[in-house]
Amino acid sequence: MLPTVIEQSGQGDRAFDIYSRLLRERIIFLGTDVNDQVADALVAQMLFLEADDPEKDIQLYVNSPGGSVTAGLAIYDTMQQVSPDVITICYGLAASMGAFLLSGGTKGKRLALPNSRIMIHQPLGGAQGQAVEIEIQAKEILYLKETLNSLLAEHTGQNIQKISEDTDRDHFLSPQEAVEYGLIDKVVSNLNSI
């Protein structure tokens, strides 16, 4: 059940679900697995906020175990294309595609709360069917791995070889380690300073 916020005005009381109220403050959330439905909602919110005010920052809070690479890339591409800066804030866990999206925020505005965790790894895939179908899926997963590694290298300043080695298995980082790695820019304990 979503919490409801009641606002009073000269025209009476209005009830909003909490996420709609926060959207008015340019705050959006990725708090689940990344899938096509979540990507559609986040892309729509970013496009709405860009149309509303192309100069004012968007805050994207991330607490996600990851999910679909293609859905995540749709969110990422939109983050890169919209005019407003996208501030990313990790609360809880940003893992896999969640960590990738966290690192894709505007340079200098990628943040994490002190007790959050960040985890990077290579894309996961499973293939079944005839040998030819498995080969097609294997080529696609290798393409996605190279794409993600290249973009992570670009956002972190690490070389591709290091990214490839570090994402070979689950690689967990504290917020401070994520700063040193280049995944984020700052650990914040007071969100009012954003």
Swiss-Prot record:
For molecular function, the Gene Ontology terms on record are: ATP-dependent peptidase activity; ATPase binding; serine-type endopeptidase activity
Record-level GO cellular component terms: cytoplasm; endopeptidase Clp complex
GO BP terms in the entry: protein quality control for misfolded or incompletely synthesized proteins
InterPro entries documented for this protein:
ClpP, ClpP/crotonase-like_dom_sf, ClpP/TepA, ClpP_His_AS
Where does the signal peptide begin and end?
A: none
Gene3D superfamilies on file = 2-enoyl-CoA Hydratase, Chain A, domain 1
Q: What is its EC number?
A: 3.4.21.92
Respond yes or no to whether keyword NAD is given for this record: no
* Pfam families on file: CLP_protease (PF00574)
- Report whether Transmembrane helix shows up as a keyword of the record: no
Which residues does the entry assign to the active site, renumbered to this chain?
S96, H121
Q: Which family does it belong to?
A: Belongs to the peptidase S14 family.
Quaternary organization: Fourteen ClpP subunits assemble into 2 heptameric rings which stack back to back to give a disk-like structure with a central cavity, resembling the structure of eukaryotic proteasomes.
Q: What does this protein do?
A: Cleaves peptides in various proteins in a process that requires ATP hydrolysis. Has a chymotrypsin-like activity. Plays a major role in the degradation of misfolded proteins.
Could you identify this protein by its name?
ATP-dependent Clp protease proteolytic subunit 3
Give the species this sequence originates from. Prochlorococcus marinus (strain NATL2A)
